[in-house]
Amino acid sequence: MELSSASAILSHSSSAAQLLRPKLGFIDLLPRRAMIVSSPSSSLPRFLRMESQSQLRQSISCSASSSSSMALGRIGEVKRVTKETNVSVKINLDGTGVADSSSGIPFLDHMLDQLASHGLFDVHVRATGDVHIDDHHTNEDIALAIGTALLKALGERKGINRFGDFTAPLDEALIHVSLDLSGRPYLGYNLEIPTQRVGTYDTQLVEHFFQSLVNTSGMTLHIRQLAGENSHHIIEATFKAFARALRQATETDPRRGGTIPSSKGVLSRS
């Protein structure tokens, strides 16, 4: 009886163990290596896999190079030295609006700050000149250097918008600026500044500044006064509108895919 009972217990335990034992399917019996899903490239012949990996490395390298180039920004740097002035200018078109100007002409420094801040350009200007005579030569040579720096920073002008248009108010003053980075220098200037000076700055030098900048940058620039009575407001609104229009023109258009924005396929001074 005891042997019979023990046998029954063992038989019952064995049945219970079988019920509790996890059931293994066919997939559980396969080697672990066989369960790894092969990628498309792993099923390719060895020489094709090597070529695919090479293309991937090249793509990553090009992407890194492009990112590095964008990080550096489009920068133009110019040094102009004459018997009258010593001027250095550096402009980053892809900057953040850093203004760093010391021209020896306080009001002009204030206007260059507007160019940097509202254009989101990094503008570095250092100048010494014969300001003991007047501001004419320093004002002119700074503008010539800025125009040349813009020309260098733009390069072949691939992918840019090319055109810029902006109207800026400053209290009672309202100034409209329209420009084209065409490679053809032209200035249309229509400001009526009521006073001869703002501080020590001769207001006649505003037109001369933009004419000099146009000559070396090769841009077509139109400046129109729609309203304004205060000389400071008129001039400052002009620089703000110019900065915003230039920012618009120099920014890249992703739809262009890096092509030159001209039906001729080229934008140049010649």
From Swiss-Prot:
NCBIfam families for this protein: PRK00951.1-3, PRK00951.2-1, PRK00951.2-4
Entry keyword Transport: no
Cofactor: Mn(2+)
Record note on cofactor: Binds 2 manganese ions per subunit.
A single Gene Ontology CC term: chloroplast
BP GO terms, sorted: L-histidine biosynthetic process
Gene: HISN5A
Enzymatic reactions: D-erythro-1-(imidazol-4-yl)glycerol 3-phosphate = 3-(imidazol-4-yl)-2-oxopropyl phosphate + H2O
PANTHER family named among the record's database cross-references: IMIDAZOLEGLYCEROL-PHOSPHATE DEHYDRATASE, IMIDAZOLEGLYCEROL-PHOSPHATE DEHYDRATASE HIS7
Pathway: Amino-acid biosynthesis; L-histidine biosynthesis; L-histidine from 5-phospho-alpha-D-ribose 1-diphosphate: step 6/9
Listed name of the protein: Imidazoleglycerol-phosphate dehydratase 1, chloroplastic
Organism lineage string: Eukaryota, Viridiplantae, Streptophyta, Embryophyta, Tracheophyta
Family: Belongs to the imidazoleglycerol-phosphate dehydratase family.
Source organism, top-level taxon: Eukaryota
Annotated stretches, region: Disordered: 250-270
Pfam families tied to this protein: IGPD
Location(s) in or outside the cell: Plastid, Chloroplast
Provenance organism: Arabidopsis thaliana
GO molecular function: imidazoleglycerol-phosphate dehydratase activity; metal ion binding
